[in-house]
């Protein structure tokens, strides 16, 4: 075993003792980041090239600073995104939301589907859809100026129409024209604050995490926004907490102009997102 792999083994134990959920992966990611190699190439780093700063970044992760803040990058589907303080770090669970959205858009057989991403954050969802649905017209909105600093970096050179504003009033010029509305909004109940992982609670912006006493305040508002934006037959996809699968689909009721409301699991088989179709006239 070379020196770097031995140090990674020690770092793994330290991170595990600190309660980090994925200690081995994070120890390897930090080593790869600092030494400019891929995780699978750590064994190729000569002992003489070991960077003593490794223990500095391990200490930061040990203190539960997000891995993505330390490395400045987050991976989402086929994207590498720039992230840091002020913007929500995209989660693997949201990849299931995007996968379902892509399948839904392709099934529509629309030549240039119009897609809106509400609460875009880093831009992960919007950019993934623009990349994987090549002829789509993708629009995204974000309220926070701090988050937008990162969004603009990630979207530089892309064809996504990015705007700053409130998701509830966004894109009046697209009313009734949108094929798909997608959102990963804040949905954590304020009462759950103390149970949120330190990486999120202490580092993600509160605006991107919490939404009222039951966590559903913004989703209730987005239901009306989605209905306003969508064409008849258009689809909405909204992420939620794994404890809200029995509640969110009921926000999209027939009485409010929806059909086919349903809930869907993520790759870990936990309730993760709700979908509904705007009813035909």
UniProtKB/Swiss-Prot annotation:
S-adenosyl-L-methionine binds at residues 142, 184. This is Release factor glutamine methyltransferase. It catalyses: L-glutaminyl-[peptide chain release factor] + S-adenosyl-L-methionine = N(5)-methyl-L-glutaminyl-[peptide chain release factor] + S-adenosyl-L-homocysteine + H(+). The keyword Phosphoprotein does not apply. Its EC number is 2.1.1.297. The gene is prmC. GO terms for biological process: methylation; translational termination. Keywords: Methyltransferase, S-adenosyl-L-methionine, Transferase. Belongs to the protein N5-glutamine methyltransferase family. PrmC subfamily. Methylates the class 1 translation termination release factors RF1/PrfA and RF2/PrfB on the glutamine residue of the universally conserved GGQ motif. HAMAP family: RF_methyltr_PrmC (MF_02126). It is an enzyme of class 2 (transferase). Substrate binds at residues 184-187. Residues 261-281 are annotated as: Disordered.
């Amino acid at each position: 075993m070379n020196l770097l792999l031995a140090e990674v083994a020690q770092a793994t134990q330290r991170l595990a003792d600190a309660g980090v959920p994925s200690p081995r992966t994070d120890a390897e990611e930090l080593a790869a980041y600092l030494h400019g190699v891929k995780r699978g190439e750590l064994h190729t780093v000569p002992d003489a090239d070991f960077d003593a700063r490794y223990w500095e970044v391990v200490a930061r992760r040990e203190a539960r600073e997000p891995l993505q803040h330390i490395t400045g990058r987050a991976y989402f589907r086929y994207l590498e995104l720039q992230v840091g303080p002020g913007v929500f770090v995209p989660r693997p669970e949201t990849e299931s939301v995007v996968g379902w959205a892509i399948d839904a858009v392709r099934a529509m057989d629309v030549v240039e589907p119009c897609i809106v991403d509400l609460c875009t954050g880093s831009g992960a969802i919007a950019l993934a859809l623009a990349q994987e649905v090549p002829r789509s017209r993708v629009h995204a909105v974000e309220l926070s100026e701090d988050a937008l600093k990162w969004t603009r970096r990630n979207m530089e050179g892309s064809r996504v129409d990015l705007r700053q504003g409130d998701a509830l009033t966004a894109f009046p010029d697209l009313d009734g024209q949108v094929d798909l509305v997608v959102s990963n909004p804040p949905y954590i109940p304020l009462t759950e604050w103390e149970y949120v992982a330190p990486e999120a609670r202490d580092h993600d912006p509160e605006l991107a995490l919490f939404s009222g006493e039951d966590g559903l305040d913004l989703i209730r508002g987005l239901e009306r926004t989605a209905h306003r934006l969508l064409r008849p037959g258009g689809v909405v996809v909204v992420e939620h907490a794994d404890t809200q699968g029995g509640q969110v689909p009921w926000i999209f009721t027939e009485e409010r102009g929806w059909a086919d409301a349903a809930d869907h699991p993520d790759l870990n088989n936990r309730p993760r997102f709700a979908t509904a179709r705007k009813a035909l006239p």
